Amino acid sequence: MNAVISGDIVSSTALNELELELLRKNVLQLIDTFTGDPSAQTGDIPFYGHLIKGDYIECYLKEPKDSLRVALIIKTLVKMMVLEKSPDNALEKKRLLFKKYGVRLAIGIGSMRTVDTEQGILDGEAIYLSGRKIDDQRSSNKEKVVIKNTLFFETTENKLKEQGSVLVDLLDVLLTNATARQCEVLHYKLLGFTESDIAQKLEVNQAAVNQHSTAVGWNSIEHTLKYYEQLEF
């Protein structure tokens, strides 16, 4: 089996052109990093990803065990973006949704019939499951200002679905409550950086990095990832 991660940016229409362009640039840079040198920081992850229409993400992973870590890396990348407060109250409500949730992501686990990276074509059970879940969320939440979940796990294997869904539901709560700075620290920890490396990168002291790491629940997240990676896919 393989994995596909499908995702769409929450309230992307509330971002101005410069913000949206920066977000797209950051996502594409991340995709290029995985694709160009999959062994850098994240380990050997056979990976292909692309951005569609500026706010829809699709990523293929040969190894399903790596899918949750990559999903969290994407999630934290989006959520660590800082937005200025808008004077328009209606617009600010939408921008707050982006700040809180960032991006909806669905992990689909299943077979893949076609993985054509040259043509950008992905087809098969895994992408059908992840894509359908995101499409369902986009339509059901179209007129709502309350979003219940933003991380999903889909597979036709009942036992695996039960195991995976419990894990992503718990992580969803942690990340929804995380601040932009906490997500930034978590993002680099997920990529394999040490707290010392992160402190230098963010130009803060290591104690501050450790404080954010503890507040976001890094130990629990790390244990959850290790458990997920040992599931029988």
Annotated model-derived regions:
Residues 1-233:
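Regulatory and interdomain segments flanking nucleotide-handling catalytic cores
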